[in-house]
């Protein structure tokens, strides 16, 4: 199929019996460029689009090309009719890809420069032909939103779609999601989906597919590899891990955080090790941690959230009246504090917290340090906060604690029952044992 190419480029491909998806080699001057021929959406009829071995896409002008050689035909062509059947019948797929937004599954419209989602199974396979080498996939666009617009009601819809996907016979689920709030959604799904039949893999892209340094292809291939081969039944985040494009890491969904605004390896496990490493070129999953939740027989759905919760990042000079207003003049049922150090705020607020907990409002303490756990028994202020009813939340990340609280509030009304659930390790959100290697050390040599 050369239908996306025109004029001279089309004639060259037709004469050589080269089709989209074939592995070819182009000689231009002293350069030899090898890669998979992709569809071209450019108005320039002299451009070939090639996917390199490192996952990047490049455009090559036909001008001054001395040789074009077919290396191997597209191995997925033989699977084309089967793939079309898969797209019509999700039950025949192995891996379900659910798109919620972001640029991880997208295609460039070169006429406008715009990037739009690849909406169908065929488009995803066209975008990434290698995916057929891993598993049969079926794609669904649940919604297409910017991740900063994610809401608890959307978490419920995603969880329902995951449950449905497993019910259709899929053995793993990949969720395409914007990176900014991916960790929140991962936590929400972890609390909402229990006894998972297989992996639920959230994946995103830090750089869209129209950029030469895009991580879209590597991340999606890695995510499908994880969904196909992982032995666990957990919600995880699968993202790029190194600047050399050699592997991706699989992070437990309740122990991961986006730690850089733009780097491709922005996601890091916090107070925990990654569960696995994905060698995407080899289509291989290497387990790094054996303490995972095994796959179960049938997935249980329990997706309810009460968003009458608030995440407070404490800072010196926090206005007492402002805090009092939040605790007394709103519908708030729970407060998560990102406190300093071992879990502190100014002692000026102790009595406010005491009154709030007596009124049935849950107050939980996490640390702004992120790494390490809270220990409110060490210093006087911490002990005062404990006496006022503030609950220490071990090594939980502030965002995870917030999502967990929303889930707990939707299930319990009694403060003591809420406290009991919040300090219980439900899905691996609390790591009872920290080792020295859990803290990253930066080298300045």
Curated annotation (Swiss-Prot):
Q: Report whether Oxidoreductase shows up as a keyword of the record.
A: no
> Which reaction does this enzyme catalyse, per its entry?
L-glutamyl-tRNA(Gln) + L-glutamine + ATP + H2O = L-glutaminyl-tRNA(Gln) + L-glutamate + ADP + phosphate + H(+)
InterPro entries on file: AsnA_fam, Asp/glu_Ase-like_sf, Asparaginase/glutaminase-like, Asparaginase/glutaminase_AS2, Asparaginase_C, GatD, GatD_N, GatD_N_sf
The chain positions of domain Asparaginase/glutaminase read: 93-425
Q: What are the record keywords, sorted? A: ATP-binding, Ligase, Nucleotide-binding, Protein biosynthesis
**Alphabetized CDD domains for the sequence:** GatD (cd08962)
* Superkingdom of origin organism: Archaea
Q: What is its EC number?
A: 6.3.5.-
One annotated GO molecular function: glutaminyl-tRNA synthase (glutamine-hydrolyzing) activity
Q: What quaternary structure, including any partners, is listed in this protein's UniProt entry?
A: Heterodimer of GatD and GatE.
- Functional description taken from the UniProt entry: Allows the formation of correctly charged Gln-tRNA(Gln) through the transamidation of misacylated Glu-tRNA(Gln) in organisms which lack glutaminyl-tRNA synthetase. The reaction takes place in the presence of glutamine and ATP through an activated gamma-phospho-Glu-tRNA(Gln). The GatDE system is specific for glutamate and does not act on aspartate.
Family, per the entry?
Belongs to the asparaginase 1 family. GatD subfamily.
Q: What is this protein called?
A: Glutamyl-tRNA(Gln) amidotransferase subunit D
Look up and give the organism this protein is from: Saccharolobus islandicus (strain L.S.2.15 / Lassen #1) (Sulfolobus islandicus)
Gene name tied to this protein: gatD
């Amino acid at each position: 199929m050369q239908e996306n190419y025109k004029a001279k480029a089309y004639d060259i491909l037709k004469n050589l019996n080269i089709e989209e998806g074939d592995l070819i080699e182009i000689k231009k001057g002293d350069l030899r460029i090898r890669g998979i021929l992709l569809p071209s959406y450019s108005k320039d009829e002299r451009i070939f689009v090639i996917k390199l071995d490192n996952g990047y896409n490049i455009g090559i002008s036909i001008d001054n090309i001395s040789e074009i050689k077919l290396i191997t035909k597209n191995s997925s062509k033989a699977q084309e009719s089967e793939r079309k059947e898969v797209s019509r019948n999700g039950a025949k797929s192995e891996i379900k890809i659910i798109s919620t937004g972001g640029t991880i599954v997208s295609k460039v419209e070169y006429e406008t420069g715009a990037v739009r989602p690849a909406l169908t199974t065929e488009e995803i396979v066209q975008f990434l032909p290698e995916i057929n080498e891993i598993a049969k996939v079926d794609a669904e666009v649940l919604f297409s939103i910017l991740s900063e617009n994610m809401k608890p009601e959307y978490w419920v819809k995603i969880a329902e779609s995951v449950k449905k996907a497993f019910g259709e016979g899929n053995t793993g689920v990949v969720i395409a999601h914007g990176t900014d709030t991916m960790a929140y959604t991962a936590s929400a799904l972890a609390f909402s989906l229990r006894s998972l039949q297989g992996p639920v893999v959230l994946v995103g892209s830090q750089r869209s597919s129209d950029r030469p340094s895009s991580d879209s292809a590597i991340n999606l291939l890695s995510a499908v590899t994880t969904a196909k081969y992982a032995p666990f039944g957990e919600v995880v985040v699968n993202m790029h891990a190194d600047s050399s494009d050699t592997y991706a890491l699989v992070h437990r969904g309740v122990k991961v955080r986006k730690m850089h605004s733009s780097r491709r390896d922005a996601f890091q496990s916090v107070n925990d090790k990654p569960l696995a490493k994905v060698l995407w070129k080899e289509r291989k999953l290497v387990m790094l941690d054996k303490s995972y939740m095994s796959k179960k027989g049938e997935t249980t759905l329990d997706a309810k959230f009460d968003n009458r919760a608030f995440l407070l990042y404490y800072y010196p000079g926090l206005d007492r009246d402002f805090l009092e207003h939040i605790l007394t003049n709103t519908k708030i049922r729970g407060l998560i504090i990102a406190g300093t150090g071992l879990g502190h705020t100014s002692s000026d607020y102790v009595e406010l917290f005491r009154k709030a907990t007596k009124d049935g409002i849950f107050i939980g303490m996490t640390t702004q340090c992120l790494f390490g756990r809270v220990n409110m028994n060490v210093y006087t202020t911490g002990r005062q906060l404990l006496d006022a009813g503030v609950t220490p939340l071990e090594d939980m990340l502030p965002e995870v604690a917030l999502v967990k609280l929303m889930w707990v509030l939707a299930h319990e009304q009694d403060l003591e029952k809420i406290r009991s659930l919040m300090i219980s390790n439900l899905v691996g959100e609390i790591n009872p044992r920290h080792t020295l290697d859990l803290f990253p050390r930066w080298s300045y040599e």
